[in-house]
Amino acid sequence: MAEQLALVIGGTIGGLLLLLLIGASCCLWRRFCATLTYEELPGTPAMATTAASSGQRDRPCQPHARTQLSRPPAVPFVVPPTLQGRDWVPLHSGEWADAPWDPCPASELLPHTSSGGLGDACMVGAINPELYKFPEDKSETDFPDGCLGRLWFSVEYEQEAERLLVGLIKAQHLQAPSETCSPLVKLYLLPDERRFLQSKTKRKTSNPQFDEHFIFQVSSKTITQRVLKFSVYHVDRQRKHQLLGQVLFPLKNETLVGDCRRVIWRDLEAESLEPPSEFGDLQFCLSYNDYLSRLTVVVLRAKGLRLQEDRGIVSVFVKVSLMNHNKFVKCKKTSAVLGSINPVYNETFSFKADATELDTASLSLTVVQNMEGDKSQQLGRVVVGPYMYTRGRELEHWDEMLSKPKELVKRWHALCRTTEP
């Protein structure tokens, strides 16, 4: 019995030792194979001869020579050289390039072969700055015909402090009424047009650099209903302010997404000097894409609205309806803007309309005020379409849209009081 027990114990110990020996052998074999998986190949004689004849120093990309190789000399793979200390410096054109230090041989010193042999070995892994250029920014060079100027600014909203941070960066291509231009900018947070913040006056320049920062205290509940307005003026010798143009920027939800500030540029628009119509005016764009059979309407803003007195919160929206043979086809609505007789929307809507339907189709844009409860009140309406339904400016707007396919045609229209179709 004792002999059998001794045999069992001896067999168990022997088996464990055998397993340990096998495991150690496997580990050593894997390490040995890993050292032979990749290895750098020596430079070709052509490389050495060329480098010596040109008087160049030894460079970090040249591999160390070895007397014996464990692999055939025709292996078409080498380990790319490690590039260290590579610095990048910014260029004035908005591109980035590496510093002058060159850790690799010049391309003319390396023989080039179509078979991808050892002559291209040192170029593997090198960075080509041409592949990492930033796209050219044409916002400072491309100005449309009749441009009044362009304004750059930044917007950031601090949710916890309920502060709107506005950065006035610069303006370019300002069109002054005289030879010299001395611009300043007034900032409003609509619908409040009584209070404003003002920049410093820049003397004798049509391309002023402001770099000023302004703070508006505004609640997070109403921030998406506000509109940032920039009015750019020229200050003449009598210190009178002459309006050069303005920019309206609605603070929609997508504008304030994220914690970082957003840099924007906008072209200046001329302020309409015509007095508001009896029931107010509505500005919108029309465009038709004949290839996609798509009719696009961009509701921009309204002015001089006759709001109905109401104890509740006043909000105004625009309803856009597509009609065909005076029959309702489809309707879309803008978001409601609170407490302003000059609301700004900047919202785009698209309708499906074949080219054969445009002779009988029309668009009805109705400005509606929300009342207490579920009630609403029409403030005014404008209809644009072919000769069958409209005349005057409304017909001209429709015809201009058809004559300029795929272009946005913008116009003001007077609202008229009429019953809803």
UniProtKB/Swiss-Prot annotation:
Extracellular face of the membrane: 1-4
SMART domains assigned: C2
Residue ranges of domain C2 in the record: 147-264, 278-399
Keywords: Cell membrane, Membrane, Repeat, Signal-anchor, Transmembrane, Transmembrane helix
GO cellular component, one term: exocytic vesicle
Topological region Cytoplasmic: 30-421
Region listing for Disordered, in residue ranges: 47-68
SUPFAM superfamilies hit by this protein: C2 domain (Calcium/lipid-binding domain, CaLB)
Pfam families: C2 (PF00168)
Signal peptide as annotated in the record: none
Entry's transmembrane regions: 5-29
GO biological process: regulation of calcium ion-dependent exocytosis; vesicle-mediated transport
GO molecular function annotation: calcium ion sensor activity; calcium-dependent phospholipid binding; SNARE binding
UniProt keyword annotation of DNA-binding present: no
Family classification: Belongs to the synaptotagmin family.
Protein task: May be involved in the trafficking and exocytosis of secretory vesicles in non-neuronal tissues.
Subunit structure as annotated in this protein's UniProt entry: Homodimer.
Domain notes: Neither C2 domains mediates Ca(2+)-dependent or -independent phospholipid binding.
PANTHER family: SYNAPTOTAGMIN, SYNAPTOTAGMIN-15-RELATED
Name of the protein: Synaptotagmin-15
Species in which this protein is naturally found: Homo sapiens (Human)
